[in-house]
């Protein structure tokens, strides 16, 4: 069940601050508060989705298309289109998901090495 008190829900309602870099009726993008690269942007839908599976199963085709096309636009605006970037989403606690509102990380601005961190 979606928790309306999660951090991203509070950012959407402006009850928590964020350095917003893009916003429209469906999407919000903002800088990560603990970046792991020079460019680290979080992109979220404004509707209530817990994770990728929830988003894909409940969102309209138009909303899905808009979300993913805007991720590309945001990455390009950040200057990452020519140098490359990584897109990450996590699903569930064991994947590393800590905020249960569907989101993508756009990470770039430096050479990214490795795919996962195996700290047991």
Curated annotation (Swiss-Prot):
Pfam families: HIT. A motif (Histidine triad motif) lies at residues 101-105. InterPro entries: Histidine_triad_CS, Histidine_triad_HIT, HIT-like, HIT-like_sf. GO terms for molecular function: catalytic activity. Residues 7-120 form the HIT domain. This is Uncharacterized HIT-like protein RP317.
